[in-house]
């Protein structure tokens, strides 16, 4: 994990809702609430966060469709603890739980029980659907997702249950799968889809010419996705190996300017495609910690958009996430207290 906590904090007073992070305790990798709170106290003003599923703490018995409730209950407990205000950041203020949408109408029972158990925080579901014809990216994916999830017979019947409950869908795909997300958005215009990680250009182990070709295709597809008003996009996830930056191979501390230089084309493409009112800044911690310390990561995102107006920065770093995930947290302003 990169650290880089000695960097000066850019715009330290800017309120941030971290739109995407995880907590888990796995062999060889433990990142729990104390670890996350340590990162949030490093200088950036993280006021709240969105917990996103990794099937951590899922139940190990009972009906398979309901097993994700274990993780939702775990995250809800953390959210309740942090909502006391004793810990600074209101971590897990919103929860995106797991659902196996291949199970069709059975998923309705999971959604209803999740809403009963975490009514103030459960806001949507995610099912990782990334696919690639090569085996290269799967070296970094602990549990290889099944193929063809979005085309499975049960997927759309399950997906149809989200909008009526006011729930969103977090889409985790590679860039070449964006046509499937676009098709889904067109078929369900009343369902909010939140694209993860800047659309996730898959460019591992490619030469410069091939990377340029990937970026051209990526940009075209992102602009097309941005034409759908019900698709939003998280800005981050750029510290993962799939982008091909190879920062994860480095042992020296990587500063925010170097990160910003590499990440800028993808961040700018995302914001151009979706606009600030449909973009949400994320840490994607701890996965992005392979390449970027928590402080340099947020510094890099701030640096890339440094020319944006105050209102645009508020939307990118706080307001869009608050609106999409219905998060209400007190934000102390200099000389007064307000709520968002």
Report each predicted region and the residues it spans.
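An N-terminally biased module of ancient metal coordination in phosphate/nucleic-acid-related enzymes
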Residues: 1-88, 299
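Mid-to-C-terminal alpha-helical segments outside catalytic/metal-binding sites
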Residues: 1-15, 19, 31-39, 47-48, ...
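Short, well-ordered coil/turn segments that N-cap beta-strands
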Residues: 12-15, 44-48, 87-94, 118-123, ...
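Conserved, mostly hydrophobic/aromatic
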Residues: 20, 49, 75, 95, ...
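Catalytic metal-binding/acid-base residues of hydrolase active sites
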Residues: 22, 55, 100, 128, ...
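Short catalytic/ligand-binding loop motif for oxyanion handling, primarily in non-cytosolic enzymes
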Residues: 25-27, 57-61, 103-106, 132-136, ...
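Active-site gating/metal-coordination segments in enzymes
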Residues: 63-177, 183-186, 199, 208-214, ...
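Catalytic pocket-lining loop regions of alpha/beta-barrel enzymes
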Residues: 146-280, 291, 309, 334-339
